[in-house]
From Swiss-Prot:
This is Glutamate-1-semialdehyde 2,1-aminomutase. The keyword Heme does not apply. It is found in: Cytoplasm. It is an enzyme of class 5 (isomerase). The gene is hemL. It comes from Mannheimia succiniciproducens (strain KCTC 0769BP / MBEL55E). Homodimer. The modification N6-(pyridoxal phosphate)lysine is found at K265. Its EC number is 5.4.3.8. It catalyses: (S)-4-amino-5-oxopentanoate = 5-aminolevulinate. Its cofactor is pyridoxal 5'-phosphate.
């Protein structure tokens, strides 16, 4: 019995399902979750001291790699002055200024402590600003676990086989309209049905919670135009894509300007940070300057701000984004070539520093229905073969993978050697 087995048994006695976030329980792949004791660079070590090349990266934040010296130094230095004050600090201004510089559509930004807080608050703000109730989201996209967003939710809810979460009142859900990702016609129909009632569209610019599904040509631009036409607020959820698809986010990569942007993951450098921001005229509707309420005891926590500032300062150095994309492409194309070699139906989507693996004979995966048609049983076998070989992938067929700047060409080669064996087992 491994140490992870023992720990999981203990955890299940005091933590629901033995984990503090459902996907970690390995329900999507079977078996016992791997308990991690330490991490450095591109690697994690389990409690039996086995090393893995890590493509989860704490689900996205670790874009520089684990335990990066610049972030660690900033956290230690800041912690020496105190852990939390519940008052304004200079460093939260520093981070806000840098975020607004890197993502120009964000004229003002409010810091929170999670991506869920960011999306929840942005939607409340959009509703208050427009004085409308209904929102549009997309099937298979996930924006955190706020009640109004767990309607045909993706990611963990897909893995659990519960596309509609119990506990969400029907009166909440009725205000959420769910359209088809990459299908502008479905969005047009929603606006035509409720032309005066829709407060906002919220969308992942790259759907990263039904694995990795990029937008098709003009999809995001089409959403922008529909929001302009009907007076709705256009919210781009960059919790996953922010600073990872491009330094200016996916909105920069795809050349589209939202009214509001939600951030998380990378902005905290591994600490719990979220943010939402956008046009000044909308952001001034938030308290204390406006009537829409939002608050948080740990919002702008100085240690989290220090980690985020150090992360983004390092990330903006010349060549980093190009290197991240280069590594991701090498991995993606290498995996596809190996799948073809072993005659395993397989497609890879990738953009910037994120990628998605699909066991399917479809040449393209562009929406929720395409994802749901993939062979999850093959993914389970592949996942465990890779785990045995020391490669840690997301333990779900519905989650994206993440590259970091700490990964090397040698790490990619090691991963592809493992994948050769894994695909051979599936042939």
């Amino acid at each position: 019995m491994t140490d992870s087995n023992t720990l999981f048994s203990r955890a299940q006695q005091v933590i629901p399902g033995g984990v503090n976030s459902p996907v970690r329980a390995f329900k999507g792949v079977g078996g016992t979750p791997v308990f991690i004791q330490k991490a450095k660079g591109a690697y994690i070590w389990d409690t039996d001291d086995k090393q893995y090349v890590d493509y989860v990266g704490s689900w996205g934040p670790m874009i520089l790699g684990h335990n990066h010296p610049a972030i660690l130094s900033a956290v230690i230095k800041t912690a020496e002055n105190g852990l939390s004050f519940g008052a304004p600090t200079p460093i939260e201004i520093d981070l806000a200024e840098l975020v607004c510089k890197l993502i120009p559509s964000m004229e003002m930004v409010r810091m929170v402590s999670s991506g869920t807080e960011a999306t929840m608050s942005a939607i409340r703000l959009a509703r208050g600003y427009t004085n409308r109730d209904k929102i549009i989201k997309f099937e298979g996209c996930y924006h955190g676990h706020a009640d109004s967003l767990l309607v045909k939710a993706g990611s963990g809810a897909l893995t659990l086989g519960q596309p509609n979460s119990p506990g969400v009142p029907a009166d909440f859900a009725k205000h959420t309209l769910t359209c088809t990702y990459n299908d502008l016609e479905s969005v047009k129909q929603a606006f035509e049905q409720y032309p005066q009632d829709i407060a906002c569209i919220i969308v992942e610019p790259v759907a990263g919670n039904m694995n990795c599904v990029p937008p098709q040509n003009n999809f995001l631009q089409g959403l922008r135009e529909l929001c302009n036409q009907y007076g709705a607020v256009f919210i781009i959820d960059e919790v996953m894509t922010g600073f990872r698809v491009a330094l200016g986010g996916a909105q920069s990569y795809y050349n589209v300007e939202p009214d509001l942007t939600c951030l998380g993951k990378v902005i905290g450098g591994g600490m719990p940070v979220g943010a939402f921001g956008g046009k000044k005229e909308i952001m001034q509707f938030i308290a204390p300057t406006g009537p829409v309420y939002q608050a948080g005891t740990l919002s702008g926590n100085p240690i989290a701000m220090a980690a985020g500032l150090a992360c983004l300062t390092e990330l903006q150095k010349a060549g980093n984004q190009e290197r991240l994309a280069q590594l991701t492409e090498k991995l993606a194309l290498g995996l596809k070539a190996l799948a073809d070699k072993h005659h395993v139906p397989f497609t890879v989507n990738y953009v910037g520093g994120m990628f998605g693996l699909f066991f399917t004979d479809k040449a393209q995966v562009t929406c929720y229905q395409d994802v749901m048609a993939c062979d999850t049983e093959k993914f389970k076998v592949f996942f465990h073969k890779m785990l045995d070989e020391g490669v840690y992938l997301a333990p779900s067929a519905f989650e994206a993978g993440f590259m970091s700047l700490a990964h090397t060409d040698a790490d990619i080669d090691r991963t592809l050697t493992a994948a050769d064996k894994a695909f051979a087992a599936l042939a």
